[in-house]
Amino acid sequence: MGRFIFISFGLLVVFFFLSGAKGSTCPFHWLPMYGLCYKIFDKLKTWNDAEMFCRKYKPGCHLASLHSKRDSIEFAEYISDYRKGWGNVWIGMWGRKEGLTCEWTDGSSTTYVAWKQNLTDHYLNKDLFCAEIVSYTGYRLWNKQDCKVKNAFLCQCGF
């Protein structure tokens, strides 16, 4: 009887590790949230180059999408802990100057936004804008920025 329990327990442990292997852990210095992993990259890139970097890092990766105030707080703490420099950070939202809609690069819904008050129209002469998390707000609020500006960036990936 004891041997049966020992073998059953061993098989259960093996099954647990095999069934949870995909998507259950993030690499070192990545933030695990909602079954995805997030990482700040300090290399300064334009918004398009940052999105391409994320996509090339691993298939299915994109610039990060934030969907709640709780997300904003978690990311603000993570960025503050791991960002080596100072400055704004690209996220995966973009939009057109004409029109009221924005889109996430991963195709998820845009029901939550955290625009700072008195948005700076750095993209005024451009058709498109890209969203950045603003450093002087403690990385909690966003700004619309010219997509050609170079910033650090936050990628999201499934592992």
Curated annotation (Swiss-Prot):
Transmembrane segments: none annotated. It holds the Pfam family Lectin_C. Coiled coil: none annotated. Expressed by the venom gland. Glycans are attached at N118. A motif (Sugar-binding) lies at residues 119-121. It is found in: Secreted. The keyword Metal-binding applies. Residues 33-156 form the C-type lectin domain. Residues 1-23 form the signal peptide. One of its GO terms (cellular component) is extracellular region. Belongs to the true venom lectin family. This is C-type lectin 1. It comes from Bitis gabonica. The lineage of its organism: Eukaryota, Metazoa, Chordata, Craniata, Vertebrata.
